[in-house]
Amino acid sequence: MAASRTATRTLRALRTSTRPALTAAPRAAFRQGGRRLYSSEPAKSGGSNIWAWAIGAGALGAGGLWYLNQDGASATPKVFAPKFDDYQAVYNEIASRLEEKDDYDDGSYGPVLVRLAWHASGTYDKETGTGGSNGATMRFAPESDHGANAGLKAARDFLEPVKAKFPWITYSDLWILGGVCAIQEMLGPQIPYRPGRQDRDAAGCTPDGRLPDASQAQDHLRNIFYRMGFNDQEIVALSGAHALGRCHADRSGFDGPWTFSPTVLTNDYYKLLLDEKWQWKKWNGPKQYEDKKTKSLMMLPADMALIQDKKFKQWVEKYAADNELFFKDFSNVIVKLFELGVPFAENSERWVFKTVNA
């Protein structure tokens, strides 16, 4: 834990003033185990003030609330339309919790917050216009029980105290803001964000099978991502998120991290794909690869498909050679993913939040 935190702070100190140009060195060490938080009770709010949704996000552009300040028998309604500073405050709270709560994989909840935002968005289907980040329907079964979403309760629970402190923000906007914050605080590129997502009930749950299956190859990847409206270059750029986090045998069945610095976003994922020698892992789990040198890293069949397919591989090579290009393309495509199917108000603007600990 201490080594992981020290390495992260060292990387932060070595940053240049131009964020996209950063090429972070791999961490010397990262925490292999530790207590994992899988569930927690939502924080309870108190006091005499009542927050109630009265105006939808579309009506006010960035959302709106009636704030009922009860004083005895009287109640004075006020319209609250959150602005940039309000969302920056939410961002700051998430960043603060990321710094304080180090009882998760490799000392950070950052990667699992990115995964939550990704999986909430990656259910979009352009033909039917269903799915996507608008709704936060993973709060409900059956979507919460989909195999691809195993372990994401930890991320949802991590954000519950933030929701309690800022009850005006929708879960849909909060989950995406959590992903944006995590990427930026893990030394990634700036990720423009705009609010306007509205929560839905269980009727909006998407069918199982819309998220990528890591055991599959390039044809499956194209079927999944083309359905959302992505091209080959965007598929490879989005895959760069695998620089973060690790797989768990009790969730996906796979096990291990992709990179030596799983809480720092760099282009190391692409470099390792090309530079390391990969072999099948001999174990009782599903088929996955391990690096021949240390046997401590893993790649999944869907990862290896990126260098087995010529059209994919050209982009792997470009991103491995140019971290700035990767950051630029990753930022563009993750914003596209996070906004799929969201009925934003006309002329709504994107914001870039100031980092707190990065």
From Swiss-Prot:
Gene3D superfamilies attached to this UniProt entry: 1.10.520.10, Peroxidase, domain 2 (1.10.420.10)
Cofactor: record remark: Binds 1 heme b (iron(II)-protoporphyrin IX) group per subunit.
GO biological process: cellular response to oxidative stress; hydrogen peroxide catabolic process; response to reactive oxygen species
Required cofactor names: heme b
Molecular functions (GO terms): cytochrome-c peroxidase activity; heme binding; metal ion binding; peroxidase activity
Catalytic activity, reaction form: 2 Fe(II)-[cytochrome c] + H2O2 + 2 H(+) = 2 Fe(III)-[cytochrome c] + 2 H2O
Subcellular location as annotated: Mitochondrion matrix; Mitochondrion intermembrane space
Region annotated Disordered, chain positions: 192-214
Annotated EC: 1.11.1.5
Membrane-spanning residues: none
Example of a GO cellular component annotation carried by this entry: mitochondrial matrix
Highest rank taxon of the organism: Eukaryota
Site (Transition state stabilizer): R115
Keywords carried by this UniProt record: Heme, Iron, Metal-binding, Mitochondrion, Oxidoreductase, Peroxidase, Transit peptide
InterPro entries named in the record: Ccp1-like (IPR044831), Haem_peroxidase (IPR002016), Haem_peroxidase_sf (IPR010255), Peroxidase_I (IPR002207), Peroxidases_AS (IPR019794), Peroxidases_heam-ligand_BS (IPR019793)
Entry's family note: Belongs to the peroxidase family. Cytochrome c peroxidase subfamily.
Function: Destroys radicals which are normally produced within the cells and which are toxic to biological systems.
Protein name, entry field: Cytochrome c peroxidase, mitochondrial
Organism ancestry: Eukaryota, Fungi, Dikarya, Ascomycota, Pezizomycotina
